[in-house]
Amino acid sequence: MSQNSLRLVEDNSVDKTKALDAALSQIERAFGKGSIMRLGQNDQVVEIETVSTGSLSLDIALGVGGLPKGRIVEIYGPESSGKTTLALHTIAEAQKKGGICAFVDAEHALDPVYARKLGVDLENLLISQPDTGEQALEITDTLVRSGAIDVLVVDSVAALTPRAEIEGEMGDSLPGLQARLMSQALRKLTGSISRSNCMVIFINQIRMKIGVMFGSPETTTGGNALKFYASVRLDIRRIGSIKERDEVMGNQTRVKVVKNKLAPPFKQVEFDIMYGAGVSKVGELVDLGVKAGVVEKSGAWFSYNSQRLGQGRENAKQYLKDNPEVAREIETTLRQNAGLIAEQFLDDGGPEEDAAGAAEM
């Protein structure tokens, strides 16, 4: 009896293998070679290529060393929180590796002087300032399908005005028009983005939902489609000012990884964005160094390998600016301890704090 059942299982297994082979060959005949394959056959499919955000702490918090290529990323937050700055830093990092980048400026507000200060190569940056949302997304689709673009930024979703709204009268009610536009565009774009290995960053604004009694009343514009299609969603906020005497020199910024399909989400980091200079890398080295135990802090003094960096955080930052070789050494050590630091980020910004954000995913 047991031999008969064993033979039956073997026969079924052979039949299934034959049926699968026949199905695979039929699919390849109909849709071309490579339309279906076993995932383990091609190692490159598993590996995720990333681009640095320009912030060491955010790269570590993302879990894969930066923002993923071939995926959709959403950066959202209040006004003047650093959304465009973060996107421009990502463009600058991609250009350093020889990548070609594009910026679809739907807000018509890109400052080329500031972009250059952040390290963006303006001569090799493609820029478009479209008149309508349809035109912006059509340009985005064409650039992505070309396969030549590494990073494409759309600034911003809220400024993608549907053609019907532009051609209509002021005060016309056109409910759901922008949401439908985004939903259709993302359905078309998502396959091309994956095939071309192009990262598309959508910058988004915040709106308030009326009549919300419990949870966060905040929501992002353009409907729910982008929340689903995005592999990474970053919530960026200004939490304070950096002052030198009475003059404000920059912003203290907090970024929460609200959604992450590539690593554990709900991590949050804090860094400085200095006016006219962008993300303060030396400030991050001091803060992360103390967190990882690489930089020692005794009272107000900061030291590294028994060598004093300065009294007070600003003096320590200035020392690292003046001594780039020490800064490089600290950065190398921090990257080697990235796993331990990432766990501390998770402890700092747990899922309880981000329950509202997670509900929006």
UniProtKB/Swiss-Prot annotation:
<keyword id="KW-0547">Nucleotide-binding</keyword>
<keyword id="KW-0233">DNA recombination</keyword>
<dbReference type="InterPro" id="IPR020584">
    <property type="entry name" value="DNA_recomb/repair_RecA_CS"/>
</dbReference>
<feature type="binding site">
    <location>
        <begin position="77"/>
        <end position="84"/>
    </location>
    <ligand>
        <name>ATP</name>
    </ligand>
</feature>
<dbReference type="InterPro" id="IPR003593">
    <property type="entry name" value="AAA+_ATPase"/>
</dbReference>
<dbReference type="InterPro" id="IPR049428">
    <property type="entry name" value="RecA-like_N"/>
</dbReference>
<dbReference type="GO" id="GO:0006281">
    <property type="term" value="P:DNA repair"/>
</dbReference>
<keyword id="KW-0742">SOS response</keyword>
<comment type="similarity">
    <text>Belongs to the RecA family.</text>
</comment>
<dbReference type="GO" id="GO:0003697">
    <property type="term" value="F:single-stranded DNA binding"/>
</dbReference>
<comment type="function">
    <text>Can catalyze the hydrolysis of ATP in the presence of single-stranded DNA, the ATP-dependent uptake of single-stranded DNA by duplex DNA, and the ATP-dependent hybridization of homologous single-stranded DNAs. It interacts with LexA causing its activation and leading to its autocatalytic cleavage.</text>
</comment>
<dbReference type="GO" id="GO:0006310">
    <property type="term" value="P:DNA recombination"/>
</dbReference>
<dbReference type="InterPro" id="IPR013765">
    <property type="entry name" value="DNA_recomb/repair_RecA"/>
</dbReference>
<dbReference type="InterPro" id="IPR027417">
    <property type="entry name" value="P-loop_NTPase"/>
</dbReference>
<dbReference type="InterPro" id="IPR020587">
    <property type="entry name" value="RecA_monomer-monomer_interface"/>
</dbReference>
<dbReference type="GO" id="GO:0003684">
    <property type="term" value="F:damaged DNA binding"/>
</dbReference>
<dbReference type="GO" id="GO:0005524">
    <property type="term" value="F:ATP binding"/>
</dbReference>
<dbReference type="InterPro" id="IPR023400">
    <property type="entry name" value="RecA_C_sf"/>
</dbReference>
<keyword id="KW-0963">Cytoplasm</keyword>
<dbReference type="GO" id="GO:0005829">
    <property type="term" value="C:cytosol"/>
</dbReference>
<protein>
    <recommendedName>
        <fullName>Protein RecA</fullName>
    </recommendedName>
</protein>
<dbReference type="GO" id="GO:0016887">
    <property type="term" value="F:ATP hydrolysis activity"/>
</dbReference>
<keyword id="KW-0238">DNA-binding</keyword>
<dbReference type="GO" id="GO:0009432">
    <property type="term" value="P:SOS response"/>
</dbReference>
<keyword id="KW-0227">DNA damage</keyword>
<dbReference type="Pfam" id="PF21096">
    <property type="entry name" value="RecA_C"/>
</dbReference>
<keyword id="KW-0234">DNA repair</keyword>
<keyword id="KW-0067">ATP-binding</keyword>
<dbReference type="GO" id="GO:0140664">
    <property type="term" value="F:ATP-dependent DNA damage sensor activity"/>
</dbReference>
<dbReference type="InterPro" id="IPR049261">
    <property type="entry name" value="RecA-like_C"/>
</dbReference>
<dbReference type="InterPro" id="IPR020588">
    <property type="entry name" value="RecA_ATP-bd"/>
</dbReference>
<dbReference type="Pfam" id="PF00154">
    <property type="entry name" value="RecA"/>
</dbReference>
